A protein has these predicted regions:
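Short beta-strand segments
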Residues: 34-36, 58, 92-96, 158-161
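Gly/Ser/Thr-rich loops at beta-strand to alpha-helix junctions
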Residues: 37-40, 97-101
């Protein structure tokens, strides 16, 4: 039996509720979330995000990559096209304590992973989330310096603490425009 079977069973129950119908393409909360793919870091759980509230991108470390920038640019352009006069959204970059990408700081782990994948060790080391507040600041700065993002897109940075369950704001949206 597939390991996905229990989730497919849950899908049948979800589909029977009908809550998925009639939803607007534009997110209700005007927030775009970028966070880690760690299963302990689910925005539906720690932020109470519900269906159609916010687009969510999850990757290793919740890091800003070229692919993430392009996805945000696409959603921004789509939002501006669909609602030319409406406000755009805030991108919330959320890193967390105890991130598994911290293993990339270990030379032996990084070297083995680089050998296995062909990825550059220096680039891998830069992806390690050891100090989530520092990496959030770096990723917010990277987003703000991107020429492909619409200037009306606000960016903020946050750290989710796995021990306390609390999210702390590291970069306020108002700071990015100062």
């Amino acid at each position: 039996m597939s390991k996905l079977r229990p989730l497919l069973d849950r899908n049948r129950a979800f589909a029977a509720t009908g809550v998925h119908t009639g939803l607007d393409l534009m997110p209700r909360l005007q927030v775009f979330l970028l966070t880690c793919l760690d299963p302990r870091v689910d925005p539906a759980a720690f932020l109470g995000v519900e269906l159609a509230d916010a687009p969510v991108i999850r990757n290793a470390g919740g890091r800003v990559t070229e692919a993430v920038i392009n996805d945000i640019a696409f959603i921004g352009y789509l939002a501006r096209t669909m609602k030319p006069d409406g406000p755009l959204f805030e991108v919330a970059v959320i890193h967390h304590t105890g991130c598994g990408t911290g293993f990339l700081a270990d030379a032996a782990f990084r070297s083995g992973f680089a050998a296995r994948t062909g990825l550059d060790e220096t680039e891998l080391a830069a992806e390690a989330v050891i100090d989530p507040a520092a990496t959030v600041r770096a990723d917010v700065a990277r987003l703000l310096s991107s020429p492909v993002l619409l200037p009306e897109i606000s960016v903020s940075g946050h750290v989710y603490d796995l021990q306390t369950g609390l999210v702390t704001t590291v970069v306020e949206p108002s700071e990015v425009w100062a």
